[in-house]
Amino acid sequence: MQKVSGSGKKTTAFQQRKSDSVYNNNEMNKGTSSISYDPVYFVRDASSFTKTTHERAASVKLKLEHLYKVTVEQTVERNQRRMDFEAKLAQDRGSEERKKRQLNSLGQKESQFLRLRRTKLSLNDFHTVKVIGKGAFGEVRLVQKIDTGKIYAMKTLLKSEMFKKDQLAHVKAERDVLAESDSPWVVSLYYSFQDSQYLYLIMEFLPGGDLMTMLIKYDTFSEDVTRFYIAECILAIEAVHKLGFIHRDIKPDNILIDKTGHIKLSDFGLSMGFHKTHDNAYYQRLFESKINTSTSSTQNSLMVDTISLTMSSKDKIATWKKNRRIMAYSTVGTPDYIAPEIFTQHGYGQECDWWSLGAIMFECLIGWPPFCSENAHETYRKIINWRENLYFPEDLHLSAEAEDLIRKLLTSADQRLGRYGANDIKLHPFFRGVNWDTIREINAPFIPQLKSITDTSYFEEIDTIPNITMNSPPVLQNKIPSDVDQNLAFVGYTYKRFDMMTQKGIL
Protein backbone atom coordinates (compact mmCIF):
# COMPACT_ATOMS: atom_id res chain seq x y z
CA MET A 1 0.00 0.00 0.00
CA GLN A 2 1.27 3.53 -0.84
CA LYS A 3 0.17 7.02 0.17
CA VAL A 4 1.12 10.53 -0.97
CA SER A 5 2.98 12.73 1.54
CA GLY A 6 2.59 16.43 1.91
CA SER A 7 5.55 16.98 -0.42
CA GLY A 8 3.85 14.95 -3.08
CA LYS A 9 6.24 11.97 -2.70
CA LYS A 10 4.87 8.49 -2.40
CA THR A 11 5.86 6.53 0.73
CA THR A 12 5.29 2.88 1.62
CA ALA A 13 3.52 1.75 4.81
CA PHE A 14 6.83 0.34 6.14
CA GLN A 15 8.62 3.68 5.65
CA GLN A 16 5.78 5.48 7.44
CA ARG A 17 5.90 3.12 10.45
CA LYS A 18 9.69 3.53 10.71
CA SER A 19 9.36 7.33 10.62
CA ASP A 20 6.67 7.32 13.31
CA SER A 21 8.80 5.08 15.53
CA VAL A 22 11.85 7.35 15.29
CA TYR A 23 9.71 10.41 16.10
CA ASN A 24 8.13 8.78 19.15
CA ASN A 25 11.50 7.66 20.52
CA ASN A 26 12.96 11.16 20.15
CA GLU A 27 10.00 12.68 21.97
CA MET A 28 10.33 10.23 24.85
CA ASN A 29 14.08 10.79 25.22
CA LYS A 30 13.62 14.54 25.63
CA GLY A 31 12.07 14.20 29.08
CA THR A 32 13.69 11.06 30.40
CA SER A 33 17.39 11.78 30.20
CA SER A 34 17.61 12.30 33.97
CA ILE A 35 15.45 9.36 35.03
CA SER A 36 17.30 6.38 36.61
CA TYR A 37 16.04 2.83 36.36
CA ASP A 38 16.36 0.30 39.18
CA PRO A 39 17.27 -3.24 38.12
CA VAL A 40 14.54 -5.84 38.39
CA TYR A 41 15.43 -9.12 40.12
CA PHE A 42 13.56 -12.34 39.48
CA VAL A 43 13.60 -14.95 42.25
CA ARG A 44 12.62 -18.45 41.13
CA ASP A 45 11.00 -20.35 43.97
CA ALA A 46 10.80 -24.06 43.17
CA SER A 47 8.39 -24.65 46.05
CA SER A 48 5.71 -22.80 44.13
CA PHE A 49 5.83 -25.30 41.28
CA THR A 50 3.29 -28.08 41.14
CA LYS A 51 4.12 -31.70 41.86
CA THR A 52 3.62 -32.50 38.19
CA THR A 53 6.21 -29.89 37.22
CA HIS A 54 8.72 -31.34 39.69
CA GLU A 55 8.11 -34.85 38.37
CA ARG A 56 8.54 -33.79 34.77
CA ALA A 57 11.72 -31.88 35.55
CA ALA A 58 13.19 -34.86 37.40
CA SER A 59 12.21 -37.15 34.55
CA VAL A 60 13.83 -34.95 31.90
CA LYS A 61 17.00 -34.57 33.99
CA LEU A 62 17.33 -38.31 34.54
CA LYS A 63 16.67 -39.17 30.90
CA LEU A 64 19.21 -36.63 29.66
CA GLU A 65 21.83 -37.95 32.08
CA HIS A 66 21.14 -41.49 30.93
CA LEU A 67 21.22 -40.54 27.24
CA TYR A 68 24.59 -38.85 27.64
CA LYS A 69 25.99 -41.74 29.69
CA VAL A 70 24.80 -44.39 27.23
CA THR A 71 26.02 -42.44 24.19
CA VAL A 72 29.50 -42.08 25.65
CA GLU A 73 29.61 -45.73 26.77
CA GLN A 74 28.49 -47.01 23.38
CA THR A 75 31.12 -44.94 21.59
CA VAL A 76 33.88 -46.14 23.91
CA GLU A 77 32.76 -49.76 23.63
CA ARG A 78 32.53 -49.58 19.84
CA ASN A 79 36.02 -48.09 19.55
CA GLN A 80 37.39 -50.66 21.97
CA ARG A 81 35.88 -53.53 19.98
CA ARG A 82 37.50 -52.23 16.81
CA MET A 83 40.89 -51.79 18.52
CA ASP A 84 40.71 -55.30 19.98
CA PHE A 85 39.75 -56.74 16.60
CA GLU A 86 42.54 -54.87 14.81
CA ALA A 87 45.04 -56.17 17.38
CA LYS A 88 43.78 -59.69 16.77
CA LEU A 89 44.08 -59.26 13.00
CA ALA A 90 47.63 -57.96 13.40
CA GLN A 91 48.64 -61.36 14.75
CA ASP A 92 46.82 -63.16 11.94
CA ARG A 93 48.96 -64.36 9.02
CA GLY A 94 46.11 -64.04 6.55
CA SER A 95 46.19 -61.81 3.49
CA GLU A 96 45.53 -58.08 3.70
CA GLU A 97 42.49 -58.52 1.52
CA ARG A 98 41.02 -61.02 3.97
CA LYS A 99 41.73 -58.72 6.92
CA LYS A 100 40.03 -55.87 5.10
CA ARG A 101 36.93 -58.01 4.52
CA GLN A 102 36.82 -58.93 8.20
CA LEU A 103 37.05 -55.28 9.24
CA ASN A 104 34.24 -54.41 6.86
CA SER A 105 32.20 -57.25 8.32
CA LEU A 106 32.73 -55.84 11.82
CA GLY A 107 31.53 -52.45 10.63
CA GLN A 108 28.39 -54.01 9.18
CA LYS A 109 27.73 -55.86 12.43
CA GLU A 110 28.15 -52.64 14.41
CA SER A 111 25.63 -50.88 12.16
CA GLN A 112 23.25 -53.80 12.48
CA PHE A 113 23.64 -53.75 16.25
CA LEU A 114 22.73 -50.06 16.38
CA ARG A 115 19.55 -50.80 14.45
CA LEU A 116 18.72 -53.75 16.68
CA ARG A 117 19.23 -51.62 19.79
CA ARG A 118 16.38 -49.45 18.61
CA THR A 119 14.11 -52.49 18.26
CA LYS A 120 11.75 -52.69 21.21
CA LEU A 121 11.35 -56.14 22.75
CA SER A 122 8.20 -57.25 24.53
CA LEU A 123 6.72 -60.33 26.13
CA ASN A 124 5.13 -61.17 22.78
CA ASP A 125 8.59 -61.96 21.36
CA PHE A 126 8.88 -65.00 23.65
CA HIS A 127 6.94 -68.22 24.09
CA THR A 128 6.75 -69.70 27.59
CA VAL A 129 7.81 -73.35 27.68
CA LYS A 130 7.51 -73.84 31.42
CA VAL A 131 7.57 -71.99 34.73
CA ILE A 132 10.64 -73.25 36.60
CA GLY A 133 10.60 -71.04 39.68
CA LYS A 134 8.44 -68.70 41.74
CA GLY A 135 9.23 -66.05 44.29
CA ALA A 136 7.75 -63.15 46.19
CA PHE A 137 8.77 -60.59 43.58
CA GLY A 138 8.16 -62.59 40.42
CA GLU A 139 8.99 -65.85 38.72
CA VAL A 140 11.46 -67.57 36.40
CA ARG A 141 10.32 -69.14 33.14
CA LEU A 142 11.93 -71.25 30.49
CA VAL A 143 11.15 -69.36 27.28
CA GLN A 144 11.83 -69.63 23.57
CA LYS A 145 12.43 -66.59 21.38
CA ILE A 146 9.85 -66.84 18.64
CA ASP A 147 11.91 -65.60 15.69
CA THR A 148 15.04 -67.66 16.39
CA GLY A 149 13.92 -70.62 18.49
CA LYS A 150 16.69 -69.99 21.04
CA ILE A 151 16.06 -71.02 24.65
CA TYR A 152 16.47 -68.67 27.61
CA ALA A 153 15.55 -68.25 31.25
CA MET A 154 13.25 -65.26 31.73
CA LYS A 155 13.20 -63.65 35.15
CA THR A 156 10.23 -61.36 35.74
CA LEU A 157 10.01 -58.83 38.56
CA LEU A 158 6.86 -57.03 39.63
CA LYS A 159 7.54 -53.28 39.65
CA SER A 160 5.10 -52.48 42.43
CA GLU A 161 6.81 -55.03 44.69
CA MET A 162 10.16 -53.43 43.99
CA PHE A 163 8.78 -50.15 45.31
CA LYS A 164 7.03 -51.64 48.32
CA LYS A 165 10.03 -53.70 49.42
CA ASP A 166 12.52 -50.88 48.79
CA GLN A 167 14.37 -52.98 46.20
CA LEU A 168 14.99 -50.35 43.52
CA ALA A 169 18.73 -50.05 44.13
CA HIS A 170 19.16 -53.82 44.18
CA VAL A 171 17.21 -54.26 40.95
CA LYS A 172 19.48 -51.74 39.22
CA ALA A 173 22.62 -53.33 40.67
CA GLU A 174 21.52 -56.80 39.51
CA ARG A 175 20.90 -55.59 35.99
CA ASP A 176 24.23 -53.71 35.91
CA VAL A 177 26.42 -56.54 37.16
CA LEU A 178 24.87 -58.96 34.65
CA ALA A 179 25.23 -56.46 31.81
CA GLU A 180 28.83 -55.55 32.65
CA SER A 181 30.05 -59.11 33.15
CA ASP A 182 31.49 -61.21 30.36
CA SER A 183 32.88 -63.78 32.78
CA PRO A 184 32.23 -67.51 32.26
CA TRP A 185 31.53 -67.67 36.00
CA VAL A 186 28.50 -65.36 35.90
CA VAL A 187 25.16 -66.10 34.25
CA SER A 188 24.99 -64.20 30.95
CA LEU A 189 22.34 -61.55 30.42
CA TYR A 190 21.22 -61.20 26.79
CA TYR A 191 18.33 -58.76 27.07
CA SER A 192 16.50 -56.70 29.63
CA PHE A 193 13.31 -54.76 28.99
CA GLN A 194 10.16 -53.63 30.76
CA ASP A 195 6.48 -52.88 30.39
CA SER A 196 4.04 -50.99 32.61
CA GLN A 197 3.97 -53.72 35.29
CA TYR A 198 7.05 -55.91 35.02
CA LEU A 199 10.80 -55.93 34.53
CA TYR A 200 12.24 -58.73 32.37
CA LEU A 201 15.72 -60.26 32.43
CA ILE A 202 16.46 -62.67 29.58
CA MET A 203 19.39 -64.84 30.66
CA GLU A 204 21.09 -68.03 29.62
CA PHE A 205 19.34 -71.19 30.75
CA LEU A 206 21.50 -73.47 32.91
CA PRO A 207 19.82 -76.90 32.80
CA GLY A 208 21.75 -78.58 35.63
CA GLY A 209 19.75 -77.03 38.46
CA ASP A 210 21.54 -75.58 41.48
CA LEU A 211 23.93 -76.64 44.22
CA MET A 212 21.13 -76.73 46.77
CA THR A 213 19.36 -79.47 44.81
CA MET A 214 22.56 -81.50 44.80
CA LEU A 215 23.03 -81.04 48.55
CA ILE A 216 19.46 -82.12 49.22
CA LYS A 217 19.98 -85.21 47.04
CA TYR A 218 23.45 -86.29 48.22
CA ASP A 219 23.50 -84.88 51.80
CA THR A 220 27.27 -84.39 51.80
CA PHE A 221 30.17 -84.30 49.35
CA SER A 222 33.60 -85.84 49.62
CA GLU A 223 36.49 -83.45 50.13
CA ASP A 224 37.55 -83.89 46.50
CA VAL A 225 34.10 -82.94 45.20
CA THR A 226 33.88 -80.10 47.71
CA ARG A 227 37.29 -78.84 46.61
CA PHE A 228 36.09 -78.68 43.01
CA TYR A 229 32.91 -76.71 43.71
CA ILE A 230 34.48 -74.37 46.28
CA ALA A 231 37.38 -73.63 43.93
CA GLU A 232 34.96 -72.71 41.15
CA CYS A 233 32.96 -70.58 43.59
CA ILE A 234 36.14 -68.69 44.48
CA LEU A 235 36.72 -67.83 40.83
CA ALA A 236 33.08 -66.79 40.42
CA ILE A 237 33.10 -64.53 43.48
CA GLU A 238 36.43 -63.07 42.39
CA ALA A 239 34.92 -62.20 38.99
CA VAL A 240 32.06 -60.32 40.68
CA HIS A 241 34.46 -58.46 42.97
CA LYS A 242 36.60 -57.39 40.01
CA LEU A 243 33.53 -55.70 38.56
CA GLY A 244 33.27 -53.63 41.73
CA PHE A 245 30.26 -55.44 43.20
CA ILE A 246 29.52 -57.32 46.40
CA HIS A 247 27.11 -60.22 45.91
CA ARG A 248 25.92 -60.39 49.56
CA ASP A 249 23.72 -63.42 48.90
CA ILE A 250 26.11 -66.26 48.12
CA LYS A 251 24.25 -69.49 48.93
CA PRO A 252 23.70 -72.91 47.29
CA ASP A 253 20.43 -71.71 45.70
CA ASN A 254 22.33 -69.10 43.69
CA ILE A 255 25.08 -71.41 42.45
CA LEU A 256 23.75 -72.86 39.19
CA ILE A 257 25.06 -75.84 37.21
CA ASP A 258 25.51 -75.54 33.44
CA LYS A 259 25.19 -78.36 30.90
CA THR A 260 28.85 -79.34 31.40
CA GLY A 261 28.54 -79.56 35.20
CA HIS A 262 30.45 -76.35 35.97
CA ILE A 263 29.01 -73.58 38.13
CA LYS A 264 27.88 -70.03 37.48
CA LEU A 265 26.70 -67.40 39.94
CA SER A 266 23.18 -66.05 39.60
CA ASP A 267 20.58 -63.95 41.44
CA PHE A 268 22.24 -60.64 42.14
CA GLY A 269 19.07 -59.25 43.72
CA LEU A 270 20.92 -58.26 46.90
CA SER A 271 24.18 -57.25 45.24
CA MET A 272 25.64 -53.84 45.89
CA GLY A 273 27.86 -51.71 43.68
CA PHE A 274 29.34 -48.28 44.15
CA HIS A 275 27.28 -46.32 41.61
CA LYS A 276 24.75 -43.85 42.99
CA THR A 277 21.88 -45.84 41.46
CA HIS A 278 22.90 -48.82 43.62
CA ASP A 279 22.08 -46.82 46.77
CA ASN A 280 18.50 -46.78 48.07
CA ALA A 281 19.02 -43.21 49.30
CA TYR A 282 19.31 -42.12 45.67
CA TYR A 283 15.77 -43.25 44.94
CA GLN A 284 14.46 -41.75 48.17
CA ARG A 285 15.84 -38.38 47.14
CA LEU A 286 14.54 -38.88 43.62
CA PHE A 287 10.98 -39.31 44.82
CA GLU A 288 11.29 -36.61 47.52
CA SER A 289 9.80 -38.83 50.21
CA LYS A 290 10.66 -42.33 51.28
CA ILE A 291 8.40 -45.08 50.05
CA ASN A 292 6.92 -47.11 52.90
CA THR A 293 8.51 -50.49 53.24
CA SER A 294 7.55 -53.76 54.82
CA THR A 295 7.90 -53.83 58.57
CA SER A 296 9.90 -57.02 58.33
CA SER A 297 12.68 -55.45 56.29
CA THR A 298 15.88 -54.17 57.76
CA GLN A 299 18.47 -51.80 56.45
CA ASN A 300 19.87 -53.00 53.13
CA SER A 301 16.59 -54.88 52.66
CA LEU A 302 17.81 -58.09 54.27
CA MET A 303 14.60 -59.54 55.69
CA VAL A 304 14.70 -61.81 58.70
CA ASP A 305 11.37 -63.18 59.94
CA THR A 306 10.60 -66.21 62.04
CA ILE A 307 10.30 -69.47 60.14
CA SER A 308 9.17 -72.66 61.81
CA LEU A 309 12.11 -75.03 61.57
CA THR A 310 12.98 -77.93 63.82
CA MET A 311 16.45 -79.25 64.38
CA SER A 312 17.37 -80.84 67.66
CA SER A 313 18.97 -84.02 66.33
CA LYS A 314 20.27 -85.60 63.16
CA ASP A 315 16.88 -87.17 62.52
CA LYS A 316 15.29 -83.73 62.35
CA ILE A 317 17.89 -82.28 60.01
CA ALA A 318 15.92 -83.97 57.23
CA THR A 319 12.98 -81.74 58.18
CA TRP A 320 15.22 -78.70 57.95
CA LYS A 321 16.36 -79.78 54.48
CA LYS A 322 12.77 -80.29 53.38
CA ASN A 323 11.90 -76.76 54.50
CA ARG A 324 15.08 -75.50 52.89
CA ARG A 325 13.44 -75.32 49.46
CA ILE A 326 10.42 -73.50 50.91
CA MET A 327 12.72 -70.88 52.40
CA ALA A 328 14.38 -70.39 49.03
CA TYR A 329 11.10 -69.24 47.50
CA SER A 330 9.91 -67.10 50.41
CA THR A 331 10.21 -63.35 50.88
CA VAL A 332 12.29 -64.01 53.96
CA GLY A 333 14.98 -66.19 52.48
CA THR A 334 17.56 -67.79 54.73
CA PRO A 335 20.14 -66.02 56.91
CA ASP A 336 22.30 -69.15 57.24
CA TYR A 337 25.03 -67.85 54.93
CA ILE A 338 25.01 -64.12 55.78
CA ALA A 339 28.11 -62.64 57.42
CA PRO A 340 27.72 -61.15 60.93
CA GLU A 341 28.92 -57.70 59.87
CA ILE A 342 25.95 -57.39 57.51
CA PHE A 343 23.55 -57.96 60.41
CA THR A 344 25.33 -55.49 62.70
CA GLN A 345 25.36 -52.85 59.92
CA HIS A 346 28.69 -51.43 61.06
CA GLY A 347 30.05 -51.38 57.55
CA TYR A 348 31.32 -54.23 55.43
CA GLY A 349 33.13 -54.93 52.20
CA GLN A 350 33.71 -57.71 49.73
CA GLU A 351 35.03 -59.98 52.47
CA CYS A 352 31.42 -60.70 53.52
CA ASP A 353 31.10 -62.97 50.47
CA TRP A 354 33.98 -65.12 51.72
CA TRP A 355 32.11 -65.80 54.98
CA SER A 356 29.23 -67.14 52.88
CA LEU A 357 31.66 -69.39 51.02
CA GLY A 358 32.89 -70.80 54.33
CA ALA A 359 29.31 -71.59 55.39
CA ILE A 360 28.68 -73.38 52.08
CA MET A 361 31.88 -75.40 52.43
CA PHE A 362 30.80 -76.41 55.95
CA GLU A 363 27.44 -77.61 54.60
CA CYS A 364 29.06 -79.54 51.74
CA LEU A 365 31.21 -81.53 54.19
CA ILE A 366 28.97 -81.71 57.28
CA GLY A 367 25.48 -81.80 55.79
CA TRP A 368 23.95 -78.60 57.19
CA PRO A 369 25.00 -74.95 57.57
CA PRO A 370 27.09 -74.13 60.64
CA PHE A 371 24.47 -71.99 62.40
CA CYS A 372 21.10 -73.47 61.34
CA SER A 373 18.56 -73.38 64.16
CA GLU A 374 14.90 -73.74 65.08
CA ASN A 375 14.08 -70.40 63.49
CA ALA A 376 15.73 -67.61 61.56
CA HIS A 377 16.04 -65.34 64.60
CA GLU A 378 17.95 -68.03 66.47
CA THR A 379 20.20 -68.45 63.43
CA TYR A 380 20.75 -64.70 63.44
CA ARG A 381 21.69 -64.81 67.14
CA LYS A 382 24.14 -67.65 66.56
CA ILE A 383 25.83 -65.87 63.65
CA ILE A 384 26.26 -62.69 65.69
CA ASN A 385 27.82 -64.81 68.46
CA TRP A 386 29.69 -67.08 66.08
CA ARG A 387 32.67 -67.59 68.41
CA GLU A 388 30.49 -69.48 70.90
CA ASN A 389 28.43 -71.35 68.31
CA LEU A 390 30.84 -72.60 65.64
CA TYR A 391 31.68 -76.25 66.26
CA PHE A 392 32.42 -79.36 64.21
CA PRO A 393 30.57 -82.63 65.02
CA GLU A 394 32.90 -85.11 66.68
CA ASP A 395 31.61 -88.06 64.68
CA LEU A 396 32.47 -86.41 61.35
CA HIS A 397 36.16 -86.30 60.59
CA LEU A 398 37.54 -83.63 58.28
CA SER A 399 41.10 -83.18 57.15
CA ALA A 400 43.10 -80.59 59.04
CA GLU A 401 43.32 -78.47 55.87
CA ALA A 402 39.54 -78.47 55.35
CA GLU A 403 38.73 -77.49 58.93
CA ASP A 404 41.44 -74.84 58.95
CA LEU A 405 40.08 -73.23 55.78
CA ILE A 406 36.53 -73.16 57.14
CA ARG A 407 37.70 -71.56 60.39
CA LYS A 408 39.69 -68.92 58.50
CA LEU A 409 36.61 -68.03 56.45
CA LEU A 410 34.12 -68.11 59.33
CA THR A 411 35.89 -65.51 61.42
CA SER A 412 35.85 -61.76 62.01
CA ALA A 413 36.09 -59.58 58.93
CA ASP A 414 39.45 -58.10 59.89
CA GLN A 415 40.96 -61.59 60.21
CA ARG A 416 39.09 -63.35 57.42
CA LEU A 417 41.01 -65.08 54.67
CA GLY A 418 40.30 -63.27 51.42
CA ARG A 419 40.09 -59.78 52.90
CA TYR A 420 43.06 -58.85 50.69
CA GLY A 421 41.76 -60.70 47.66
CA ALA A 422 40.98 -64.18 46.37
CA ASN A 423 44.64 -65.14 45.88
CA ASP A 424 45.07 -65.60 49.63
CA ILE A 425 42.37 -68.28 49.58
CA LYS A 426 43.78 -69.94 46.46
CA LEU A 427 47.12 -70.39 48.24
CA HIS A 428 45.56 -72.31 51.14
CA PRO A 429 46.85 -75.91 51.46
CA PHE A 430 43.33 -77.30 50.95
CA PHE A 431 43.62 -76.32 47.28
CA ARG A 432 47.03 -77.85 46.71
CA GLY A 433 47.11 -79.31 43.20
CA VAL A 434 44.25 -77.19 41.82
CA ASN A 435 45.03 -75.67 38.43
CA TRP A 436 43.11 -72.40 38.63
CA ASP A 437 43.63 -71.56 34.97
CA THR A 438 42.18 -74.76 33.53
CA ILE A 439 39.66 -75.91 36.14
CA ARG A 440 36.74 -75.09 33.86
CA GLU A 441 38.19 -77.37 31.19
CA ILE A 442 38.28 -80.54 33.30
CA ASN A 443 35.37 -82.94 33.71
CA ALA A 444 33.02 -81.95 36.52
CA PRO A 445 32.06 -84.49 39.24
CA PHE A 446 28.45 -84.30 38.08
CA ILE A 447 27.37 -83.77 34.47
CA PRO A 448 23.64 -83.34 33.76
CA GLN A 449 22.11 -86.01 31.55
CA LEU A 450 19.83 -84.00 29.27
CA LYS A 451 17.29 -85.29 26.77
CA SER A 452 16.67 -81.97 24.99
CA ILE A 453 17.47 -78.27 25.11
CA THR A 454 14.28 -77.73 27.13
CA ASP A 455 14.94 -80.52 29.65
CA THR A 456 13.99 -79.24 33.13
CA SER A 457 14.32 -82.53 35.01
CA TYR A 458 16.90 -80.98 37.36
CA PHE A 459 14.38 -78.35 38.46
CA GLU A 460 11.64 -78.98 40.97
CA GLU A 461 8.17 -79.40 39.49
CA ILE A 462 6.25 -76.16 39.83
CA ASP A 463 3.36 -77.93 41.60
CA THR A 464 5.70 -78.77 44.47
CA ILE A 465 7.04 -75.24 44.76
CA PRO A 466 5.36 -73.19 47.52
CA ASN A 467 2.32 -71.35 46.21
CA ILE A 468 3.81 -67.86 46.13
CA THR A 469 2.15 -65.96 43.33
CA MET A 470 3.06 -62.77 41.57
CA ASN A 471 -0.24 -61.20 42.60
CA SER A 472 0.28 -58.60 45.29
CA PRO A 473 -2.05 -58.23 48.29
CA PRO A 474 -4.08 -55.04 48.52
CA VAL A 475 -1.88 -52.12 49.51
CA LEU A 476 -2.56 -48.64 50.76
CA GLN A 477 -2.88 -45.97 48.12
CA ASN A 478 0.21 -44.14 49.31
CA LYS A 479 2.28 -47.26 48.67
CA ILE A 480 1.28 -47.49 45.04
CA PRO A 481 3.91 -45.75 42.89
CA SER A 482 2.74 -43.33 40.26
CA ASP A 483 3.49 -43.93 36.59
CA VAL A 484 6.00 -41.08 36.74
CA ASP A 485 7.78 -42.67 39.71
CA GLN A 486 8.01 -45.99 37.89
CA ASN A 487 9.38 -44.33 34.79
CA LEU A 488 12.01 -42.51 36.83
CA ALA A 489 13.10 -45.56 38.78
CA PHE A 490 13.66 -47.78 35.76
CA VAL A 491 15.19 -45.37 33.26
CA GLY A 492 18.04 -47.19 31.51
CA TYR A 493 16.90 -50.71 32.39
CA THR A 494 16.78 -51.85 28.74
CA TYR A 495 19.82 -53.79 27.52
CA LYS A 496 20.97 -55.89 24.56
CA ARG A 497 24.28 -57.77 24.47
CA PHE A 498 26.52 -57.07 21.46
CA ASP A 499 28.37 -60.36 21.16
CA MET A 500 25.16 -62.38 20.98
CA MET A 501 23.49 -59.93 18.60
CA THR A 502 26.21 -60.36 16.00
CA GLN A 503 26.67 -64.10 16.01
CA LYS A 504 25.50 -66.22 13.14
CA GLY A 505 21.76 -66.52 13.48
CA ILE A 506 21.16 -63.07 14.91
CA LEU A 507 18.92 -63.01 17.95
UniProtKB/Swiss-Prot annotation:
GO terms for cellular component: cell cortex of cell tip; cell division site; cellular bud neck; cellular bud tip; cytoskeleton; growing cell tip; incipient cellular bud site; mating projection tip. Its EC number is 2.7.11.1. It catalyses: L-seryl-[protein] + ATP = O-phospho-L-seryl-[protein] + ADP + H(+); L-threonyl-[protein] + ATP = O-phospho-L-threonyl-[protein] + ADP + H(+). Residues 432-505 form the AGC-kinase C-terminal domain. Disulfide bonds: none annotated. Keywords: ATP-binding, Kinase, Nucleotide-binding, Phosphoprotein, Serine/threonine-protein kinase, Transferase. GO terms for biological process: actomyosin structure organization; budding cell apical bud growth; cellular response to salt stress; cortical actin cytoskeleton organization; establishment or maintenance of actin cytoskeleton polarity; maintenance of protein location in cell cortex of cell tip; positive regulation of establishment or maintenance of bipolar cell polarity regulating cell shape; positive regulation of exocytosis. Residues 126-431 form the Protein kinase domain. The keyword Disulfide bond does not apply. CDD domains: MobB_CBK1, STKc_NDR_like_fungal. SMART domains: S_TK_X, S_TKc. GO terms for molecular function: ATP binding; identical protein binding; protein serine kinase activity; protein serine/threonine kinase activity. It comes from the Eukaryota. The active site is at D249. It holds the Pfam family Pkinase_C. PROSITE patterns: AGC_KINASE_CTER, PROTEIN_KINASE_ATP, PROTEIN_KINASE_DOM, PROTEIN_KINASE_ST. Residues 1-30 are annotated as: Disordered. ATP binds at I132, G133, K134, G135, A136, F137, G138, E139, V140, K155. Coiled coil: none annotated. InterPro entries: AGC-kinase_C, Kinase-like_dom_sf, Pkinase_C, Prot_kinase_dom, Protein_kinase_ATP_BS, Rho-assoc_Ser/Thr_Kinase, Ser/Thr_kinase_AS. Protein kinase that seems to play a role in signaling pathways necessary for cell growth and mating. Belongs to the protein kinase superfamily. STE Ser/Thr protein kinase family. COT1 subfamily. PANTHER family: CITRON RHO-INTERACTING KINASE, MYOTONIC DYSTROPHY S/T KINASE-RELATED. This is Serine/threonine-protein kinase CBK1. It comes from Pneumocystis carinii. The lineage of its organism: Eukaryota, Fungi, Dikarya, Ascomycota, Taphrinomycotina. The gene is CBK1.
